[in-house]
């Protein structure tokens, strides 16, 4: 084979390789294009499905939002309808009150007309008597001049003395009759005012107790509340000062304590712990603190609601909060806040009947026992504390005097002060309103805590077990272990000297030191 032939064969082979490579590359390119087209179509299909899913999800969310908005709108409409109904009821009540006032005014006008007619008759009777006296004087004078040798002046003097004696006797009789009639009318008027006020003021009182019950979902929860070796129940009792009674009562825990605020705090905290399910000392401290804040908010709301219901406005915000604390105070078993509202209504009604300032009378009646809201740490009677509070928050002098005089400590200087004292007596003396035994029991428990907290270094104390035990928390940096034993003996001796109680009282002094560090 010649070189030329070899070159030609090589060229042909190269050309053949190029043609074959061209067709191979074309086939591969077409396959890639077909694959890319299929992938693009798949991506487009997936995008369409995703878009459809997003569209459906957006529609569902829009429907849910529309449903929520519809529910909110319906709720708002119901609330506005209820508010309008309440306003309508208040307007109807005001109309009824105005009608009663008009009737009272008409009755007073009729009474005044009757009295005026009676006075006119008396005046006419007196004038007739004066005419008769003048006639008698003339007759006596003529007779004396005829049969007597007396001078005119002497006869005149004798006649005047005789007439004076007769008139003095008649005037004394008339004065006595007038006084008796005035007393009878005053008694009838007072009884009428009191009966009318009592009939127009109807208030219910529920006897306060010293226990609360917390319902449990099951009896297994009792073991979780007690905790390992009783640490949970001890923590809750220490933080709240309330005694937890866990007995055979199914699905229930009893909270016992004489301080309603502490008992309510413990009840709310225990409810939260049961609902949450996590019960351990750290969680208990957190829930007790939250419960204290909730109780404070509730106290403020009760004060605002009370002022609104009674119709007393313009009270200082601090005084409103103090007023709300009366919700958790009792006097001989009678709730002090309900008692204060009843006194306010009675005083206002009686003031209206007598033409006095009803709003000022309500204000004085509502605040007359405000001193009972202050804890026993502040010295002084509730009257003295109430006067200090009213003076501090610049209340009206009539209100201050009503507080000071409603138990007879001072003389009342206004009719409103007398009405407040009368309303207080009416509310307290109503059968079933008060209970002596419960009040004495609560006073004994308060005295226990007062004695315990009077010593230096004591942080707080709690009377528990129905007054059979008092637990004293002391400051660890102020009292050591030996001083804690001596403090327990001193408190025990003072309790024996100052209190009368059945059985024995256990005095427990607790000194606790904590070291807390945070790992970062």
Curated annotation (Swiss-Prot):
GO terms for cellular component: plasma membrane. It holds the Pfam family RNase_Y_N. GO terms for molecular function: identical protein binding; RNA binding; RNA endonuclease activity. SUPFAM superfamilies: Eukaryotic type KH-domain (KH-domain type I), HD-domain/PDEase-like. It is an enzyme of class 3 (hydrolase). Magnesium. Can also use manganese or zinc. GO terms for biological process: mRNA catabolic process; mRNA processing. Residues 1-3 are extracellular. Residues 210-273 form the KH domain. Its EC number is 3.1.-.-. Residues 29-141 form a coiled coil. Residues 25-520 are cytoplasmic. Its main location: membrane. It is a single-pass membrane protein. The keyword Coiled coil applies. Belongs to the RNase Y family. Endoribonuclease that initiates mRNA decay. Initiates the decay of all SAM-dependent riboswitches, such as yitJ riboswitch. Involved in processing of the gapA operon mRNA, it cleaves between cggR and gapA. Is also the decay-initiating endonuclease for rpsO mRNA. Involved in degradation of type I toxin-antitoxin system bsrG/SR4 RNAs and a minor role in degradation of type I toxin-antitoxin system bsrE/SR5 degradation. This is Ribonuclease Y. It comes from Bacillus subtilis (strain 168). The lineage of its organism: Bacteria, Bacillati, Bacillota, Bacilli, Bacillales. The gene is rny.
């Amino acid at each position: 084979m010649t070189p030329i032939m070899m070159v030609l064969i090589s060229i042909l082979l190269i050309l053949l390789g190029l043609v074959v490579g061209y067709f191979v590359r074309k086939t591969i390119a077409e396959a890639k294009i077909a694959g890319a087209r299929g992938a693009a179509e798949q991506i487009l299909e997936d995008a369409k499905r995703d878009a459809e899913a997003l569209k459906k999800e957006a529609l569902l969310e829009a429907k849910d939002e529309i449903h929520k908005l519809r529910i909110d709108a319906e709720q708002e409409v119901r609330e506005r309808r209820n508010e309008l109904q309440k306003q309508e009821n208040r307007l109807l009540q005001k109309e009824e009150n105005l009608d009663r006032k008009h009737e009272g005014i008409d009755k007073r006008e009729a009474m005044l007309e009757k009295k005026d007619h009676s006075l006119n008759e008396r005046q006419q009777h007196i004038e007739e008597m004066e005419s008769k006296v003048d006639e008698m004087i003339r007759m006596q004078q003529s007779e004396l001049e005829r049969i007597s040798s007396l001078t005119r002046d002497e006869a005149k003097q004798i006649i005047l003395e005789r007439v004076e004696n007769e008139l003095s006797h008649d005037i004394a009789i008339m004065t006595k009759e007038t006084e008796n009639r005035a007393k009878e009318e005053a008694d009838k008027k007072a009884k009428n005012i009191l009966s009318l006020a009592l009939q127009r003021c109807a208030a219910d009182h529920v006897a306060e107790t010293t226990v609360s019950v917390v319902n449990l979902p099951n009896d297994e929860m009792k073991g979780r509340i007690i905790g390992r070796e009783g640490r949970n129940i001890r923590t809750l009792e220490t933080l709240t000062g309330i005694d937890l009674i866990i007995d055979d009562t199914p699905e229930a825990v009893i909270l016992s304590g004489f301080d309603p605020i502490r008992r309510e705090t413990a009840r709310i905290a225990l409810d939260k712990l049961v609902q949450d399910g996590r019960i351990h000392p750290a969680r208990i401290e957190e829930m007790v603190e939250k419960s204290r804040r909730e109780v404070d908010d509730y106290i403020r709301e009760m004060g605002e609601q009370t002022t609104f219901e009674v119709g007393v406005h313009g009270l200082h915000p601090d005084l409103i909060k103090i007023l709300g604390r009366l919700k958790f105070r009792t006097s001989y078993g009678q709730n002090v806040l309900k008692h204060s509202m009843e006194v306010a209504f009675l005083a206002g009604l009686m003031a209206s009947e007598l033409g006095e300032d009803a709003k000022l009378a309500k204000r004085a009646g509502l605040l007359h026992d405000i001193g009972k809201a202050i804890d026993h740490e502040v010295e002084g009677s509730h009257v003295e504390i109430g006067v200090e509070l009213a003076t501090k928050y610049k209340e009206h002098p009539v209100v201050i005097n009503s507080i000071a005089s409603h138990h007879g400590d001072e003389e009342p200087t206004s009719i409103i002060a007398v009405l407040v004292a009368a309303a207080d007596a009416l509310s307290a003396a109503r059968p079933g309103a008060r209970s002596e035994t419960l009040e004495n029991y609560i006073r004994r428990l308060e005295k226990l805590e007062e004695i315990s907290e009077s010593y230096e270094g004591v942080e707080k104390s709690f009377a528990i077990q129905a007054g059979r035990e008092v637990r004293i928390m002391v400051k660890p940096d102020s009292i050591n272990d030996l001083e804690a034993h001596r403090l327990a003996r001193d408190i025990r001796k003072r309790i024996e000297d100052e209190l009368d109680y059945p059985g024995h009282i256990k005095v427990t002094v607790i000194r606790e030191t904590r070291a807390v560090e945070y790992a970062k």
